């Protein structure tokens, strides 16, 4: 008899101040030039849409969305390196896009490193397309800089 092994349930919820140590830890393990704990705290204090994805009651990823004037900007989307390749990034992105739609956002923007092929593939799959390039946007190793690809996705048009 073949048994099916079920994946542990995941839950997406609002990020709270108690999540910041785990979020900061994931950020440090994911990026060479990570956001500081204070940047995450400031995002919460500013009222940005901050969410976490939990697996087995442990934060496995997070996303941060800024909304203003009918536009949204995905500021950060990250999955713990130990939990990648399970579709959690896509689940987080779907949740962020749902928040944007609920806020009647017309267009969502983000920056991504052109070297981050996994993220680029996910964003393209979800309908984002390149609209610009920001030269020398990201810090890179050995004092170098890396450009950012600016991606956008149109959501439903809302009448004013």
Model-derived regions: residue spans:
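Conserved catalytic-core motifs of GNAT/GCN5-like acyltransferases
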Residues: 109-111, 124, 129-147
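Short helix-coil transition/hinge motifs at the ends and kinks of transmembrane helices
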Residues: 2-6, 140-143
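Short glycine/proline-centered loop/turn elements that form peptide/ligand docking sites
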Residues: 93, 116-119, 136-142
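Acetyl-CoA-dependent GNAT
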Residues: 3-7, 11-86, 90-99, 103, ...
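Short hydrophobic/aromatic beta-strand or adjacent loop that forms the aromatic wall/cage
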Residues: 48-50, 145-150
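Short amphipathic helical patch at the helix-1/turn junction of helix-turn-helix
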Residues: 79, 113-114
């Amino acid at each position: 008899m073949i048994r099916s092994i079920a994946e542990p349930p995941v839950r997406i919820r609002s990020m709270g101040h108690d999540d910041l140590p785990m979020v900061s830890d994931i950020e440090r393990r994911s990026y060479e030039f990570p956001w500081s704990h204070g940047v995450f705290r400031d995002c919460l204090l500013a009222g940005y849409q901050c969410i976490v994805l939990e697996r087995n009651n442990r934060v496995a990823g997070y996303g941060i969305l800024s909304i203003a004037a009918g536009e949204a900007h995905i500021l950060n989307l990250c999955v713990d390196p130990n939990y990648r390749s399970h579709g959690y990034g896509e689940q987080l992105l779907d949740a962020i896009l749902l928040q944007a739609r609920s806020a009647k956002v017309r267009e969502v923007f983000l920056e991504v490193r052109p070297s981050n092929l996994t993220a680029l593939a996910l964003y393209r799959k979800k309908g984002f397309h390149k609209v610009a390039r920001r030269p020398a946007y990201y810090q890179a190793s050995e004092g170098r800089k890396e450009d950012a690809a600016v991606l956008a996705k149109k959501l439903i048009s809302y009448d004013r």
